[in-house]
């Protein structure tokens, strides 16, 4: 007993000694703020500054003397990018960096299902953790202002409420893996043309009402640990060191406690970077002033020049303590988080998640019969068609490649052609139909006319003998398409696809058009193509998702997260002169102001070809008459709107019920209506469910520039229950007191 007592006493003393020797910053049982304070007190000025800039293409330094590790970052709103060389953009050619390519974020937004966002964030977080990444550069929540923006496919559509609701679960689930979301591009990076210097000018109202809400939700609701600054200027000052957007709004108003990281090469001035809210400077070509073959990370704006300014007293020491504290907080949450899971990559669970997200995001734009009183063309009945011709470069193209920083190295990729052949077998033949060039960034192949003519002629000849033609076309992720670094050059389909569609229709009316893109396109043939599917960029399981929808194994339930204008000038950004879009290369003005997307179409009475929120099903839904819980809402009260929705078809389906609110009379211009709530409802054949939405005074407010505050004006309002922004199923009126 005595020996046991002595052993216990010795063990207790040993534990006490070890505990006493463990610095607070290394003790993960301590609060993060205590750890940050302790680590900061032990660091030299040089060590603090070293945290603030890159040490390689995708990493920033830790504090080796204190055992604080570096931060590793990776591109990847929809997949973890393959390993990049230490000091240039070349791929490192690892053999173990293949991953799951998830659907692009336009597809995720088109699910209108926050559960899919959570599933997405969880899976991509597990892959990033397995790849030992601390910061994932995504999600992107810039608003879809124009269909010409080459990077729209990385974002979540035109509506700030939809983007807000869909980004939050992604961020929360991602960060449960000890991987920081880096929400981008803050703010107003709404075009790629001249993105590095274009000076965006706009009203405070449109900034707060349209372009900031998703970022605000990411910070205040999602708890995002980092934010990426944009390349562009905002009212004369670069977004990566913009005092108004970073210090006042992000850090003061929203109480953001994380890091602001530049887009690569987005810093331009040491003093502004020091005092205007930037925390970590990353760069495309070291500091932008030397060739990337030269190792000059110490010449970054937030490196030696910043250190010298601090020593000379030209910037306050408080700036470096704030930056270092934020970076340490990020490191403790990620690289030094001992509770983080191990992670996994390219698992069956992840493939299943990618497939399900694709299934829920694919949008059935049109599904008409070929002959009057006939059945709609979709789904494709295997017993009805013996010869199915699949046409199109996108049917076989690896759409995980290209696009700039979104390029992915998928472990397994199922093409649309492979997916359809898995269902329909040897009934499926293939013709390329058009050429689209090699996957490249920054340039595009020229396609000889004889190649264009030959491929089209082959497809048309084969279409004559087919029972059904499925054209898988759209855009791709090459330069001047859906790609970083440049905007589209035309609103119409590229590579002669309009002519191909006309030629195919001339020999076979049974045409299903599948558009793979992250943008709207012009459709001069829309009235004559019986079935049109918006298929997005679907990732690893894209072919399976597409086959699930076309075959009817899954009933489509996606709805558009942005409007499809009939012509480009029907889009608000393009309804004015070039100063509105693309600008004069120096500056631009958002002349449509708050009337972005469906807000423009509604208010200006310019019908969209396919409206925001539109999406068909293989079943049908009816809506009952909506009922409000009261005739008026008190200033401190709420009001509910309830509507019954019934599946009147013969198969199960999901309907997205949308609630918009409009102000009957206001002292400032307001859109006809704005999205405030939505619900995705699963219904069996014949089943009916009631959907209830709760409105609060916040749902009725606009940003008042005179008082720099959100307010509503008492009066009459309408709540619109809709199947899309243009398909109003019921209206209830109420008063706001």
What residue spans do the PLM features occupy?
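Short beta-strand elements
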Residues: 727-737
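Glycoside hydrolase catalytic-domain context in secreted enzymes
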Residues: 17-702, 709-726
């Amino acid at each position: 007993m005595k020996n046991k007592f002595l052993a216990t006493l010795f063990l207790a003393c040993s534990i006490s000694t070890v505990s006493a020797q463990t610095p607070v910053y290394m003790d993960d049982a301590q609060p993060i703020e205590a750890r940050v304070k302790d680590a900061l007190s032990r660091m030299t000025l040089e060590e603090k500054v070293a945290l603030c800039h890159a040490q390689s293409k995708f990493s920033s330094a830790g504090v080796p003397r204190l055992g604080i590790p570096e931060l590793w970052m990776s591109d990847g709103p929809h997949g973890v990018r393959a390993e990049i060389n230490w000091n240039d953009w070349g791929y490192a050619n690892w053999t173990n960096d293949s991953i799951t390519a998830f659907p692009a974020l336009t597809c995720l937004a088109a699910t209108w299902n926050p559960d899919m966002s959570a599933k997405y964030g969880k899976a991509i977080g597990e892959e990033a953790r397995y790849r030992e990444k601390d910061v994932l550069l995504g999600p992107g929540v810039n608003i879809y202002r124009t269909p010409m923006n080459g990077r729209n496919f990385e974002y979540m559509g035109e509506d700030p409420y939809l983007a807000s609701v869909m980004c939050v679960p992604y961020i929360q689930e991602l960060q449960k893996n000890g991987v920081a979301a880096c929400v981008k591009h803050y703010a107003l990076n709404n075009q790629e043309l001249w993105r590095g210097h274009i000076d965006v000018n706009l009203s405070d109202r449109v900034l707060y009402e349209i372009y900031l809400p998703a970022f605000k939700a990411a910070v205040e609701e999602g708890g995002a640990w980092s934010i990426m600054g944009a390349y562009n200027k905002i009212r004369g000052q670069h977004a990566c060191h913009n005092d108004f957007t970073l210090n006042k709004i992000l850090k003061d108003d929203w109480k953001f406690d994380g890091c602001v990281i530049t887009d690569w090469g987005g810093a331009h001035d040491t003093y502004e970077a020091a005092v205007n809210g930037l925390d970590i400077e990353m760069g495309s070509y070291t500091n932008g002033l030397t060739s990337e073959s030269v190792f000059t990370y110490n010449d970054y704006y937030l490196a030696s020049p910043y250190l010298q300014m601090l020593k000379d007293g030209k910037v306050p020491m408080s700036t470096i303590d704030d930056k270092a504290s934020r970076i340490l907080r990020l490191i403790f949450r990620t690289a030094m988080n001992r509770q983080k899971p191990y992670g996994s990559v390219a698992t069956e669970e992840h493939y299943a998640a990618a497939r399900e997200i694709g299934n829920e995001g694919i949008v059935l734009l049109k599904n008409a019969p070929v002959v009057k009183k006939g059945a709609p063309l979709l789904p494709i009945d295997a017993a009805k068609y013996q010869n199915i011709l699949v046409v199109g470069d996108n049917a076989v193209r690896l759409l995980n490649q290209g696009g700039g920083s979104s390029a992915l190295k998928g472990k397994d990729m199922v093409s649309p052609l492979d997916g359809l052949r898995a269902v329909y077998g040897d009934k499926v033949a293939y013709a390329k139909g058009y050429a689209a060039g090699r996957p490249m960034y920054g340039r595009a192949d020229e396609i000889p006319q004889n190649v264009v003519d030959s491929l089209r002629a082959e497809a048309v000849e084969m279409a004559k003998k087919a029972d059904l033609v499925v054209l898988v076309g759209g855009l791709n992720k090459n330069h001047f398409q859906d790609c970083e670094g440049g905007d589209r050059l035309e609103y119409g389909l590229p590579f002669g696809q309009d002519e191909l569609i006309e030629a195919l229709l001339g020999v076979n009316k049974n045409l299903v058009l599948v558009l793979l893109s992250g943008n709207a396109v012009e459709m001069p043939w829309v009235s004559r193509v019986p079935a049109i599917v918006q298929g997005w960029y679907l990732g690893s399981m894209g072919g399976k998702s597409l086959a699930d929808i076309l075959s009817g194994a899954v009933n489509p339930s996606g709805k558009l997260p942005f409007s499809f204008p009939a012509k480009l000038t029907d889009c608000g950004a393009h309804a004015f002169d070039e100063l509105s879009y693309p600008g004069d290369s120096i500056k631009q003005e958002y002349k449509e102001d708050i009337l972005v997307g469906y807000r423009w179409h509604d208010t200006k009475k310019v019908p969209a070809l396919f409206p925001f929120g539109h999406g068909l099903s293989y079943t049908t839904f009816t809506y009952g008459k909506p009922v409000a819980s009261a005739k008026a809402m008190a200033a401190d009260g709420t009001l509910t709107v309830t509507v019954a929705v019934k599946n009147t078809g013969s198969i199960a389906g999901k309907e997205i019920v949308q609630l918009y609110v409009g102000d009957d009379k206001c002292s400032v211009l307001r859109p006809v209506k704005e999205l405030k709530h939505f619900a995705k409802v699963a219904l069996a054949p014949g089943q009916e469910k009631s959907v209830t939405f709760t409105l609060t005074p916040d749902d009725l407010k606009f940003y008042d520039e005179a008082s720099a505050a959100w307010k509503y004006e008492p009066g009459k309002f309408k709540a619109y229950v809709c199947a899309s922004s243009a398909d109003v199923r019921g209206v209830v009126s109420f008063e706001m007191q």
